[in-house]
Structure formats: C-alpha cells, structure tokens
Amino acid sequence: MSYYDNILEIDSNLDGNGLCIGIVMSRFNIDVSEGLLGACTAELTRLGVQEADIVLTTVPGALEIPVALQKLAESDRFDALIALGAVIRGETYHFEVVANESARGLAAVGREYNIPIANGILTTDDEDQATARMAEKGGETARVAIEMANLVLTLDEMDQSAPT
C-alpha cells in the first residue's frame, strides 16, 4: 500500500501464492474453451498459484456456467472463480440471449457470495475472432482473478482491523 496526498492507496497484487481458484469451463466451442483454459492455467501457475489449488469443472454451455460457479462459491473454499467459454454469433437472436444471460448470471453469483469472478466467456462474431483472442483473454482472466482475490482479502483484513 502507498499513500498519495494522505489517501491510502491499495496497490494491485498479482501474487497467487496461497490462493485457491475455481474454474468453470464450457464444453461448447471446445477448441476455443481449451485454448482459454491453457492460457489461464499457465498464467495462474506463473503467478504462483499451485496446481493443487486449481479446481476445474466443465459444463455443457455458457448458460450453465453460473450454476456451477454458484456451487463452487457455496463451498467457501475458493478465493476467486473464473468462467471460461465462447459464445459465437450465429444467425439467430440466441447469441444475445446466451451472451447477456451468462454475464448477468456471473455478476449475480459474485455479488451474492461476495467472491470475485473473472469473466473469460468470449463473445465474438466468428470462430477466427475467438481463436485470435483466446490466449490473451485466458491469461487476462487469471490476472483478474488473482488481483481481485488479493484485493478482497486486503479489504477484509482492513475491515477486521478497523476500530469499532
């Protein structure tokens, strides 16, 4: 932490040591999902999360991700959760429904259980766009999960040490 003109600033913290991360991955558009997963887990371990502290579960599609995240959140075992998948535009309105409802579900679970959830569900016009974005987005979700887990832990510590 640093002080700037008498304002306490909480620095970002990308140290994954000691964190437990849950990942829910959609099996729909599996090649893209696995690309996201590979980049995500590589970045998690590079930042210090132990493989034994990463739990992966898979679900049929993006709409099922929030339910699995909710069950992981209920376990109170995880410091942060990650959602991975790809919703690729088709010729029907279904794309918008899946993209919007999966994102809404992630946000609802995060708020209800007070747990950070990194959204790695790609929404693209075609498979080429998804393939082009999967490596960067996979790594980004790992960094978001670690940074937000550490922020929540820091804020919890500050709350506990505050005078009552």
From Swiss-Prot:
Keyword Iron-sulfur: no
Residues binding (2S)-2-hydroxy-3-oxobutyl phosphate: E91, T92, R133
An annotated GO cellular component: riboflavin synthase complex
Top-level class of the enzyme under EC nomenclature: transferase
GO biological process: riboflavin biosynthetic process
Gene Ontology MF terms in the entry: 6,7-dimethyl-8-ribityllumazine synthase activity
Transmembrane segments: none
Residues at the catalytic site: H94 (proton donor)
Alphabetical list of CDD domains matching this protein: Lumazine_synthase-I (cd09209)
InterPro entries from the UniProt entry: LS, LS/RS, LS/RS_sf
Entry's EC annotation: 2.5.1.78
Transferase in keyword set: yes
Highest rank taxon of the organism: Bacteria
Keyword line: Riboflavin biosynthesis, Transferase
Reactions performed catalytically: (2S)-2-hydroxy-3-oxobutyl phosphate + 5-amino-6-(D-ribitylamino)uracil = 6,7-dimethyl-8-(1-D-ribityl)lumazine + phosphate + 2 H2O + H(+)
Pathway participation: Cofactor biosynthesis; riboflavin biosynthesis; riboflavin from 2-hydroxy-3-oxobutyl phosphate and 5-amino-6-(D-ribitylamino)uracil: step 1/2
PANTHER family: 6,7-DIMETHYL-8-RIBITYLLUMAZINE SYNTHASE, 6,7-DIMETHYL-8-RIBITYLLUMAZINE SYNTHASE DMRL SYNTHASE LUMAZINE SYNTHASE
Function: Catalyzes the formation of 6,7-dimethyl-8-ribityllumazine by condensation of 5-amino-6-(D-ribitylamino)uracil with 3,4-dihydroxy-2-butanone 4-phosphate. This is the penultimate step in the biosynthesis of riboflavin.
Protein name in the entry: 6,7-dimethyl-8-ribityllumazine synthase
